Amino acid sequence: MAEKGEGFYPRQVPIDAYGNGGFRFGGMSHRGSLLCFPDGIWAWPVTSIAELTIAALEPAFARADQLDFFLIGGGRDPFVLPDRLRKRFRDVSLSVDAMPTGAAVRTWNVLLAERRRVGAALIAVP
């Protein structure tokens, strides 16, 4: 995960658009994937579901007590979260749902509007 000031947006905001390898939010454009939390939106180097590891998702596990729900947008297609990752989310008592990035962005925006304690890992769609 990038350090503050390096691929960091300092608050939780809706995602306005996604595609072409990035996202638009907060009046700016970002190329690449994102980790979104109540304390901000971070650049995230993951580019495919093959790169989803416990280490890649560690920022979510570290913030589990600050979240009620975590979304994983895995790109264009639906996918099943591997058992080892589901188990890790269970171990930290954090509900998780895996879906295509578009669905995750829409769900993020709805949960944010409801003022829910939500986090998301969003893999950029080409």
What are these regions (language model features)?
Residues 60-98:
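Mid-chain, well-packed structural core segment of small domains
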Residues 43-45, 78-81, 107:
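Short active-site-adjacent helix-start/loop capping segments
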Residues 101-106:
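Short acidic loop-to-helix transition motifs that present clustered carboxylates
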